[in-house]
Amino acid sequence: VQWCTCILTLTSPEKKQYHVTAAFPSACGKTNLAMMLPKLPGWKLQTVGDDIAWLKPGEDGRLYAINPENGFFGVAPGTSNDSNPNELKSCKKGTIFPNVVLTPDGDIWWEDMGIDAPAEGIDWKGNPCYRCIDDRKRMGPKPGMTKAEIKESKYVAAHKNSRFTAPAVNCPVLDKAGFNGKFNGKATGVPIDAILFGGRRPSTIPLVNQAKDWAHGVFMGSAAGSEVTAAVISDQIGQVRRDPMAMLPFFGYNVCDYFQHWLEMERTSADATKLPKIYFVNWFRKGDDGRFMWPGFGDNSRVLKWICDRIEGKVKAQDTPIGYLPFAKDISLENNTGKDTVNPKFLKEIVKVDKAGWLKEIEGVEANYAEYEKKPSKDSKEELAHAPRIPRALKAKLAEIQAALAAAK
């Protein structure tokens, strides 16, 4: 399987290694996660890849992954020493920066970089731009503009989807063996312990949700949706767009066949009990005030620890209609310090099931499935016979979850 996902190596304080893949739509944090500096003491994260994985079943039943790329392709705006120091260090040399600000001395700058803007520069359109007079970390299209004026104009000096393309060897936390496709000295790729799907969802979707079985995990991936960001060329910014397995722009063949291929992995595995556990994560829940309820970035290591604890059978979970959710007490709050911290009150909210929201979510998935199954324009027997069909196992999971939600108190 070729798949748009990052690959990371996570090492616990007990020196136990886990390999995790995470498939998110563009601008939802794949690169940030792949190079994260864990907030939890004693945990170490290394990067295998930030964008693509090739997956292959092993003779032992495990799923192995390699990174076929030789570098990183990250979103520039928002990348800073606070959000992801390892990502910024990866850009120190040999890096291409399209559509960012060019400074008079030949350097680069972008919004939320965490450093002062230059007094003047050339913006992503090739036009002059100037430092804001009351916020040294903002730039406007005219000299002497205030922060309020720039905000009202919706001007950005660096394009919201401006990027950096850096060689992988620059990464200070590169897992060199994993990057070279080796595990225990053999060129097998790294064995995957957990698969994460995710998206940018301001409501309904909990912080982390574990699939109850392989088919349920494939359903999670098939149902994935995300708030549209500037990384997508669209006039629907802010609306939820279905993006199954974070592969919508990249499917090389019919999406229904792709789902079936994932389902077949369980049947064809040499030992299906060794397949990775599947989870759905959401770092982007918002409160009624529109602010994020989870700090993200290095604090996402708290969720990864819970996932590892589940793999090891160390913690129990809430058995809900939508999957296994964590008890808030099992999300570690060790070293919960700094500028952005986990709010325990918010944490309790984002590990609950929003019944009404989920019933609407299931309706949305059902409607999206129907789109994939649209009949051909001509009703010939041959075309009808080859019309795409959502696998029965996924429809059964949808019906099962819908019924369980309806019956829940």
Give names to the regions the model predicted.
Residues 1, 15, 24-29, 40, ...:
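Active-site-proximal structural scaffolding
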Residues 1-20:
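Active-site-adjacent "gating/activation" loops or surface patches in catalytic cores
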Residues 6, 45, 193:
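Residue-level detector of short, conserved catalytic/binding motifs and their immediate flanks
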Residues 8-11, 23, 66-67, 196-198, ...:
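Residues in well-ordered beta-strands of folded domains
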Residues 11-16, 38-47, 58-60, 269-274, ...:
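Secondary-structure transition/capping motifs at alpha-helix termini
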Residues 12-15, 26-29, 38-39, 52-54, ...:
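Short, glycine-/Ser/Thr-/acidic-enriched flexible segments
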Residues 19-28, 32-107:
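Catalytic or ion-translocation cores adjacent to nucleophile or general acid/base/metal-coordination motifs
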Residues 77-80, 85, 91-409:
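Conserved NTP phosphate-binding and transfer environment spanning the P-loop NTPase/kinase superfamily
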